[in-house]
């Protein structure tokens, strides 16, 4: 095996081992030594690829991202109306959560860790940021589609909470309880009603 391919395989093995342990034990419950042991490499080799455990955590989260699902978030900021923006964002977030239970689990761990440095991913520039979504909400406020008295940050937070809630409750236990089109329509209608009144 040539050196570049071996290096790539080692990196993949480290990320795969870290993912398994982070999903099982969270950030604080997993040490670099644990990851090295599972990956069958020296701890120092992990530090060759990653400057610290936080960088490895963010890389693991990035490895869980399905670019196709996340690109639909980018489509949200292209919408001309607040109604279509909310509908696209609800649908995009539904698809992301429904197709990625491992990401939900790692985000649950992240919330429990109470460590703000764990937020985001290593290559954040590839995805639409919360700042961009908030900027789009402010555009809708400036164009009269949404009351200016509402905080753009809290609007995005409210949409995020509404779209993740079913997945943090019982969705994983009974996937038949949530019908995609009904969820998108009902959630969109309720959010629009809440923001317009």
Q: Positions of the model-derived regions?
A:
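Helical hydrophobic small-molecule/effector-binding pocket
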Residues: 86-109, 160-164
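Amphipathic alpha-helical linker/stalk segments
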Residues: 58-88
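Helix-turn-helix
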Residues: 13, 17, 21-55, 59-60
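Short helix-capping/turn signature of helix-turn-helix
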Residues: 50, 109-114
């Amino acid at each position: 095996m040539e050196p570049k391919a071996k290096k790539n395989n080692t990196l993949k093995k480290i990320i795969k081992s870290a993912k398994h342990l982070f999903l099982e034990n969270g950030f604080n419950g997993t040490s670099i030594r644990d990851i090295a042991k599972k990956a069958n490499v020296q701890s120092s080799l992990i530090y060759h690829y990653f400057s610290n455990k936080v960088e490895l955590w963010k890389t693991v989260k990035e490895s869980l991202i399905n670019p196709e699902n996340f690109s639909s978030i980018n489509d949200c900021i292209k919408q001309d109306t607040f109604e279509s923006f909310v509908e696209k964002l609800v649908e995009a977030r539904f698809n992301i959560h429904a197709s990625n239970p491992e990401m939900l689990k790692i985000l649950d761990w992240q919330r429990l860790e109470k460590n703000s440095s764990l937020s985001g991913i290593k290559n954040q520039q590839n995805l639409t940021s919360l700042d961009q979504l908030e900027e789009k909400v402010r555009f809708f406020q400036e164009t009269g589609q949404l009351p200016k008295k509402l905080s753009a940050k809290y609007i995005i937070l409210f949409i995020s909470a509404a779209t993740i809630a079913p997945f943090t409750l019982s969705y994983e236990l009974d996937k038949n309880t949530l019908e995609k089109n009904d969820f998108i329509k009902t959630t969109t209608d309720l959010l629009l009603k809440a923001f317009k009144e």
